[in-house]
Amino acid sequence: MALTWTIIWWCLLLVILVNEIAAIYTVFREKRDIAATWAWLLVLTLIPGFGFILYAFFGRKLPHKQLARIKSQTQLKLKQALERQKQQFINMPKPKDQTVQIYRRTVMLFQSIDDSFLTRHNAVNIFTNGNALFKKIFDDIAAAKKSIHIEFYTIYNDQIGNELRTLLEQKAAEGVEVRVLYDSWGSMGVWPSFYDHLREVGGYAAPFLMSQSNFFDFRINYRDHRKIVVIDGEIGYVGGFNVGDQYLGRVPKFGPWRDTHLRIVGGGVYGLQRRFIGDWNASM
């Protein structure tokens, strides 16, 4: 009996030792800030086995090459234009109107902390109802002449999702450039084959930052929560609505859905187009 307990204790110690070694290797093989390093080390140490499951979902970072590709695409044709605009505001005479001075400081703040640039001559419509929003999006898509770029976290295989796909297939068949970027986690349950006919008629569809062979990825971080539509480089949509019947109040358990989305015509569309192109190129 004593020998049995001795074997059990040795096996337990071996498991703990292996878990500790695996935890240290897992955490320190990726560069991260000190707080995150120690937090994950504690999780993996104090919750053997299950801690690694949590890490698979929440802790893994993207490969360095992929992060570098995202960063390079984010700066796509932006730095020079942003620097010119910064200099314009720095050299601008100080306005006498205090309100204008406050706006000037706000613009310069956004330019400095987030590389955001000021755009002008924008006409903006606000939508808080999904039915009105998608009717307008569909009307603009139907009138597209050159390109349709769509990026959503969620595109469901339901009534509104199929209506959108059918319309995109029609436009692609007409020769319009159609590109769809979706998040594989947010659109879980929608197989890549959902877009097969769109591809057959000349359109493109791809999951964000993943190849088709990696459709299932347990990584919950580094997801694409953007909801962007850019049509002909002239009309842009951005906001909170995803593509799904629940966002139109058609699913009883969700009830009426309230969110906010913008339709933009003007200089601001350039920012949406740049964001889409950067995400698309980084995902290829």
Predicted regions and their residues:
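N-terminal localization/anchoring segments of enzymes in phospholipid and broader phosphate metabolism
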Residues: 1-284
